[in-house]
């Protein structure tokens, strides 16, 4: 992954991802907790990203060492 954006389905996180897309970056792992929120789902659908992980799944993957270190991490999750 070139970038990980936590909170990437929210207003600020999705706009950070759109800026990354405009700079040619689409190898983005988006991490969030959608909870069935249609607005967040719409935000997530509005930009290119390589993968999406739910917050708890991401935490478990980090603890298990299954997440490749990104070039950049934008921590915008609450």
Where are these regions (language model features)?
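N-terminal Rossmann-like NAD(P)+-binding domain of SDR-like oxidoreductases, especially those catalyzing
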Residues: 1-78
């Amino acid at each position: 992954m070139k970038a990980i954006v936590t909170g990437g389905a929210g207003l600020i996180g999705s706009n950070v991802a759109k800026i990354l897309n405009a700079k040619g970056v689409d190898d983005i792992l988006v991490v969030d907790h959608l909870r069935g929120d249609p607005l967040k789902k719409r935000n997530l659908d509005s930009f290119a990203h390589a993968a999406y992980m739910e917050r708890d799944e991401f935490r478990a993957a980090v603890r298990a060492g299954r997440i490749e270190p990104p070039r950049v991490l934008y921590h915008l999750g609450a």
